[in-house]
Each structure stands twice: as C-alpha cells, then as structure tokens.
C-alpha cells in the first residue's frame, strides 16, 4: 500500500513541474570538466554554456572575462552587463541575444510585466517562470530570477531541479538567444 501512495504522489508531483533537463546532459563537456567539479555558485556559467551551446570550460572563461566573475563566488552585475552587451549587439560564442520585455521609464531596466483580466478588472502581473514558458514555448532563453540564472530551451528548464518545480518565481530579466 505504501508503495502505491508513494508512486501516486510522484506522478501527481510531476504534473506540477515543468519539463527539466539535467545540466550534465545539456552542457557540452560538463561531466568531464575539472573546473565544473570544483565550482560553486556557477548558475550564470551553466546558463551561458547551455543557452549559447558552448562547453562549460569556455563559458567559465567568458563569464570570468566579460562579467568579472571570481571562482566560486557567483556573478555580480549579470543583468546590467547582459543588457549592455545586448544593446551593443555583442555576441557570445558566435550567437547574438536580445533583451526581452519593455524598457522601464528609468531607462536601465526592462519589465516582463503583462496585463490580464481578473474579475472584469485589468490587472498588471509580473511574469513567472510558468507563464513565461506558456507564452514562449519555442526558442532559447537565458532567464534570471532573484539571485539565480538558468536556461529555458523549447519549454525545457536547464538548471537546478528546483527551477522546474518553482513555476511561480518572478522573472527579473530574460534574453532570447539567437535573435
């Protein structure tokens, strides 16, 4: 009986989660990389590698040089730097990328908010990961939520397992790769 309950909760749990691919399967050279084995706080490196289809070690080098990332320390200022690179049409691994959303009135950030109707009233909502995938089922996107980055490729989340489970996380910024 316990096994049936366990398998049923697993099946039901799958319904509430987005399609997910392990970084080790999605990133070229990830499993073989000695750098990856010793690295922590490398979500930006993983998102660049999977989003731009380059190997992990090359992505690590790019993030270190372009974003001034220190080993095992995370990437600070990622969103403004990506926006700046996108606006100046710089490429990463031979691919261009485009900022998603509308430019804010302050001019330095972009908003992915949208209007929806709730009980006859127009309400402004912040874009969540789940809504983003519904609105953008095809394409490759680098996505930032609070203090974290990952890739969404053709509706499949590439990053940490939690990224596919936490569908209601608000997206702070996103870039479409290859546009």
How should each PLM-predicted stretch be described?
Residues 159-179:
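Noncatalytic regulatory segments and standalone regulatory/sensor domains
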